[in-house]
Amino acid sequence: MVLSAADKGNVKAAWGKVGGHAAEYGAEALERMFLSFPTTKTYFPHFDLSHGSAQVKGHGAKVAAALTKAVEHLDDLPGALSELSDLHAHKLRVDPVNFKLLSHSLLVTLASHLPSDFTPAVHASLDKFLANVSTVLTSKYR
């Protein structure tokens, strides 16, 4: 799915509004995913998955950092996320459906924190962006 110039502008603007809350929102999205889709917990058997856990916060920060990198490299997502794609495909072997579940949880989290900025156009652009990120992260499964 190709991001238009308007989509790229919407994604950059929305992520700019996230600002210093990226790690916090990443952790919240993970918690939301674990609660809404309990099967996703199977990939984190060694984590304390309770609310506010340091491990969930730490992984949320990693998710946020990866998304920040993706936003900074919208024109080369495969290059920017190549190592992360290798990790998830070859070492962690995460079921690709989980990226969609996390994307949904991220959209809900962003909508709850940025209600006035989360217009239908921004929602659509972020959804396309996260779908592209998911596609890149699962590209090495084949």
From Swiss-Prot:
Alphabetical UniProt keywords: Acetylation, Heme, Iron, Metal-binding, Oxygen transport, Phosphoprotein, Transport
Modified sites of kind N6-succinyllysine: K8, K12, K17, K41
Domain of life: Eukaryota
Disulfide bonds: none
Residue numbers of Phosphotyrosine PTMs: Y25
Entry-linked InterPro entries: Globin, Globin-like_sf, Globin/Proto, Hemoglobin_a-typ, Hemoglobin_oxygen_transport, Hemoglobin_pi
Ranges where the Globin domain occurs: 2-142
Residues bearing PTM N6-acetyllysine: K17
Phosphothreonine modified-residue sites: T109, T135, T138
Tissue localization of expression: Red blood cells.
Known role: Involved in oxygen transport from the lung to the various peripheral tissues.
Quaternary context: Heterotetramer of two alpha chains and two beta chains.
Descriptive protein name: Hemoglobin subunit alpha
Gene name as annotated: HBA
